[in-house]
Amino acid sequence: MYPVDLHVHTIASTHAYSTLQDYIAEAKQKGIKLIAITDHGPDMVDSPHEYYFINMRIWPRIINGIGVLRGIEANIKNINGDIDYTNKFTKLDLVIAGFHETVFPPQDVKTHTTAMIATMAQGQVHIISHPGNPNYPVDISAIATAAARYQVALELNNSSFTHSRVGSEPNCRAIVAAVRDANGWLSLGSDSHISWSLGNFHHCQRILQEESFPIDRILNVSPQRVLSFLQQKNKCIIPEFNNF
């Protein structure tokens, strides 16, 4: 089991079903130490208002012994790599970004690859969400090389093997192998939209084992590894986690 989940949605994304408190209780029960709340960016049709992200500053850093990162799953908007993460949100700890049909309709490999690399190059994003989505094929080798260059983790998303983005597994396998060969970072995300799936990386673990991916390049191994990654990426130091 990994003690960190870096992709979680609450009822603020209205197609999800659990509250922050629900996730804290579930994390406590499962022995998860650190979670990132990453509700959908404001360009999604049922996303929270921008005030929701701004007001995350009132959240305690540690709740009942569980560390909470303030995050967003932003939307890649165009081929220039722009995302719906504005200067108003700059106090967030973790920025995930990915393609979603209602914001960036699927196009072709070249367009998707160019947009994803441009997003990474802008320097705001820590993790690219579900890059194995078959609706958005990319040049996997180029994406993995760029991710390593820009210190961006590529996500292995457990829900891509179950009910979302059907047909993702071949791409996800290729991404894991490409990140391994590029000496990049992988992030595991449950992409939970209900608390019961928090920390469920069952399918991710199977792929990691079968592709012989090194554990020292997986962010979720410990809270300390995630916090160190954030600090190295953009000098994000969270004093409340100094002794966490």
Curated annotation (Swiss-Prot):
Its EC number is 3.1.3.-. Binds 3 Zn(2+) ions per subunit. Keywords: Hydrolase, Metal-binding, Zinc. Pfam families: PHP (PF02811). This is Probable phosphatase BCI_0316. The lineage of its organism: Bacteria, Pseudomonadati, Pseudomonadota, Gammaproteobacteria, Candidatus Palibaumannia. Zn(2+) 2 binds at H15, H40, H193. Belongs to the PHP family. It is an enzyme of class 3 (hydrolase). Gene3D superfamilies: Metal-dependent hydrolases (3.20.20.140). One of its GO terms (cellular component) is cytosol. Its cofactor is Zn(2+). One of its GO terms (molecular function) is zinc ion binding. CDD domains: PHP_HisPPase_Ycdx_like (cd07437). InterPro entries: Phosphatase_YcdX_put, PHP_dom, PHP_phosphatase, Pol/His_phosphatase_N, Pol/histidinol_Pase-like.
